[in-house]
């Protein structure tokens, strides 16, 4: 099962739905040094390209989120859209930012489009976000899903402030450093994506 489905299963579906994930996350993931936190943890990020490390991944998803950081804690609103089922998913995540300033592990709740909690976070599951590179309007992150502290699946995500943009040279260079090829990624502008910018913008107020 692809990571996106697993992430949603943790908060929305039965936890048993995640059985069959590929296992350990990538080990060559290094957080960016001297990340400009004020710039990264602001505004809305759109996922323009992603690579699910599960070779059996088939479902397609669109993703956007609005992360905020204050006092060493990251709080973010997350929006997923399943292209196949045409279903939208709303979540909010919270977790501590590590001392390097570019990595955090969070648990997330299921909410409605107005941000009202529907289901609290399951303490058994968490996800770790590592900012590998961030430059101007683009970024590269790695997401790892854990169950009881053990890795169960991961993906790489190229972000941009513009939902239809291409990654800049710095992001492409970062991909090369972790031995990834952009042509292997799913390009979300080729999908019939739907976004809920109102949900994310309300989180920013």
From Swiss-Prot:
Keyword field contains Acetylation: no
Swiss-Prot/TrEMBL keywords: Disulfide bond, Heme, Hemostasis impairing toxin, Iron, Metal-binding, Oxidoreductase, Platelet aggregation inhibiting toxin, Secreted, Signal, Toxin, Vasoactive, Vasodilator
Signal peptide extent: 1-20
Molecular function as annotated in GO: histamine binding; metal ion binding; nitric oxide binding; oxidoreductase activity; toxin activity
Primary location class: secreted
Binding site for heme: 80, 91
EC number of this enzyme: 1.7.6.1
SS bond list: 25-144, 62-193
Protein's GO biological process: modulation of process of another organism; vasodilation; venom-mediated perturbation of biological process
Tissues and organs where the protein is expressed, per its UniProt entry: Expressed in the endothelial cells of the salivary glands.
Subcellular localization, as worded in the UniProt entry: Secreted
Cofactor(s) essential for the protein: heme b
Gene Ontology CC: extracellular region
Comment on bound cofactor: Binds 1 heme b (iron(II)-protoporphyrin IX) group per subunit.
UniProt note: pH dependence: Optimum pH is 7.5.
Binding site for histamine: 52, 154
Enzyme class: oxidoreductase
Reaction catalysis annotation: 3 nitrite + 2 H(+) = 2 nitric oxide + nitrate + H2O
Oligomeric form and interacting partners: Forms oligomers (at pH 5.5).
Protein task: Converts nitrite as the sole substrate to form nitric oxide gas (NO). NO(2-) serves both as an electron donor and as an electron acceptor. Binds to negatively charged cell surfaces of activated platelets; binds to L-a-phosphatidyl-L-serine (PS)-bearing phospholipid membranes. Once bound on an activated platelet, NP7 releases its stored nitric oxide gas (NO) into the victim's tissues while feeding, resulting in vasodilation and inhibition of platelet aggregation. Also acts as an anticoagulant by blocking coagulation-factor binding sites.
Family of this protein: Belongs to the calycin superfamily. Nitrophorin family.
Protein name (record): Nitrophorin-7
């Amino acid at each position: 099962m692809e990571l996106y489905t697993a992430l949603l299963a943790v908060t929305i579906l039965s936890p048993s739905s995640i059985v069959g994930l590929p296992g350990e996350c990538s080990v060559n993931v290094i957080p960016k040094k001297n990340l400009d936190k004020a710039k990264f943890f602001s505004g809305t990020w759109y996922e323009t390209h992603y690579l699910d490390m599960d070779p059996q991944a088939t479902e397609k998803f669109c993703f956007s989120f609005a992360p905020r950081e204050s006092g060493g804690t990251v709080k973010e609103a997350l929006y997923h859209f399943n292209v196949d089922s045409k279903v939208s998913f709303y979540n909010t995540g919270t977790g501590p930012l590590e001392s390097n300033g570019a990595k955090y592990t969070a648990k997330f709740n299921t909410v409605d489009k107005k941000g009202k909690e529907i289901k609290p976070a399951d303490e058994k599951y968490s996800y770790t976000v590592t900012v590998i590179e961030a430059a101007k309007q683009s970024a590269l992150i790695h997401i790892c899903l854990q169950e009881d502290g053990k890795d169960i699946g991961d993906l790489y995500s190229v972000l941009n402030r513009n939902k239809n943009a291409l990654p800049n040279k710095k992001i492409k260079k970062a991909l090369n450093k972790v031995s990834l090829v952009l042509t292997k990624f799913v390009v979300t502008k080729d999908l019939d994506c739907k976004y809920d910018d109102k949900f994310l913008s309300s989180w920013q107020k």
